Amino acid sequence: MRKGLLKPLRSFLILLLLSTEAYTQDIHFSQFFETPLLRNPALAGIFTGDIRVQAVYRNQWNSVTVPYQTGSFSAEYKKSVGSGNDFLTLGGEILYDKAGTVALQATHILPAITYHKSLSDEKNMYLSLGFMGGWVQRSIDRSKVTTNSQYDGTGFNPGLSTGETFPRNSYSYLDGTAGMSFSSQIGENTDNNIYLGVAYHHFNKATKVSFYGNPNYEMIPKWVGSLGVRMNISEYAFFTLLADYSKQGTFTETLAGALYSWKLDDIEEPKYILHAGAFLRWKDAVIPVTKLEFKPFAVALSYDANLSQLKPASNGHGGIEMSLSYQKYINKPNSSADAVRCPVF
């Protein structure tokens, strides 16, 4: 009997989460460095090239419940503007998330624009301001909702009412993010770089963000601070430090780590680079990462080893994440190749 109740009780817990004041955690990825727009729209364009396209897929909690599946697709196009060393990045992010037995789904379509102001005649120091905003829709499959009201005294009875009434099974809203970043070369070596950024997510505080349509429910703004440092170790090797700190209401998250990288061929213009390292999501997971660049493409694979209170139930298993990226210069007069020196992250 206890086994028969696990599924409805689990679904009931998920349902409770859906009916709260939308204080749930935003979509996030362990390979956060492959989703720059999601971190901070002012990080758009901070790469070597004119165009960058990135796709990330995450599959989580297979060992505990119905898998949580999340996907991200983003694109950026960078071009010089004016007669100085400034440039502009146009881009966008599409997110899809499906979670749990009630098939809670979210779709985000978010165009972005970022302006990069040059602070140096050497074209190696920039202050960037970015905005991203668009449409978000969330939905559930009410036919898959089960609760303990469907327990008839002897077992689970799907013919009984769930006892829950939703005014709507989907809702949508507009969402906006603003951010700033500072990026610069470190010292005389053009390969050594740093960036710092801060972003304010959900600045418009969208209301009625619940399946009950309650106007008192609103999105809680989120602050995200970002850091990236890239330093040469030798002619053939370098390391990259990356970190994010997020705060949304009472929820905080710290994610940080490093990648060690080896150039596998020409040291000046390597086509093949192998990266390996690990990240820590504080009190939640250790995340080993491997990445291979074969320019203009790159693929990365990571895995979350669970450290949280779910570790006994999940046997330490978390989620697997895969990413594919493409970036290069384009042979056009408005290319940024000769106009800027971008951090080589």
Descriptions of predicted regions:
Residues L13-L18:
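Hydrophobic alpha-helical targeting segments used for export or membrane insertion
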Residues Q25-F345:
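Subset of outer-membrane beta-barrel
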Residues T20-T24:
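Sec/Tat signal peptide C-region and signal peptidase I cleavage site
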Residues R2-F12:
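Bacterial N-terminal signal peptides that target proteins for export
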